[in-house]
Amino acid sequence: MSNVGIIGGGVSGVISAIYASKNGNKVTILEKNNDILKKLLITGSGRCNYFNSDQNIKHYHSKNEEYLNEIITKENIDELCCFYDSIGIVPKIKDGYYYPYSNMAISVKNALVTEVLKSNIKLICNYDVKSVDYKNNEFIINNDKHFDKLIISTGSKAYPKTGSDGFGYSFVKKLGHTINEVKPALVSLCSDDKILNIISGVRANAKISLYHFDELLKEEIGEVQFVKNEVSGICTFNLSYLVTKNNNVRINFMPFIKVEEYDDFMLKNNNKRVKEILNGILNPKLILAIIKRCNINEEKYFYELSKKEKELLKENLISFRIDIKGKGPFDKAQICMGGVPLNEIVIKSMKSKIKKLNWKFYLILINIREYLSN
């Protein structure tokens, strides 16, 4: 039997504790907040989408891609699903997303807490870890707690208000690991474009394309949300890991037709006023923004527009450009990119190649579902 210490009482730390206890170890969770699983409660807007059935390797990005096939395996996926089933979570599945049947994150938290209590795991809350040392084949926390093995699952820098401020990275670095730069991911994109003042609050089904100057980096289709100084929405989040400098997005508000079919579509509406055509496609605020950009009279019939006006209208309907100055901060990011490189980890066990540490995904250099590592 080993004496196992776990720094961090998030989902990774708690599930690790449960498994370690089942394997006959003495387990202690050290949590800096006054309770465990704080971030879990805000997952999925409080509904807790705890699993996604689409585990295609294409959704995972890392410089060490050769390791991903060892992590994302059918065996591991099945084990995770069986675990949630074993603690009484009945899934409600929507578009591949798994939610508890109650549609409430508290149900998942309560199930995990019950399992912790049943497993005789020692839980110490309001415990602020200041130092981690490795001496004489043991880990020493704050010079007063001693463990044979240590699991660091302290969380990234995303949502620091939950206590996840990235403090664990300093311990990892001190123990000999590399820490690649940690950046926000799954986050909105920032812009100074004044047009956002007009379309703030609008949601539109569209195709959004991210460019570096004029080089296309990636495209997504879905709901794009506009707020003051930001472009948001899930499809936008999925592009955010690629944002550096000199980026722009171009939005196609007519993804329901092929670009080469645009002219035929407009020709069919040749005898309609511009505002009548746009009214069937766009939110009124978007109509106002596009009319403003094109500087055309919305009362004109389409056939009355000049060639230049038609070209401007086409450009703004299928390639509405917004220059991007960066992305949102850590307190708005759902996850982070960066951390411990996968080549410093024994993948099958998640153990450190340097010390007898066990890792959880919060500190490993991998981003999940379109938002992976740098």
Predicted regions span which residues?
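A conserved short coil-to-beta-strand element within the FAD-binding core of flavoproteins
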Residues: 125-138
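Short beta-strand to alpha-helix junction loop
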Residues: 68-76, 95-114, 159-164, 302-309
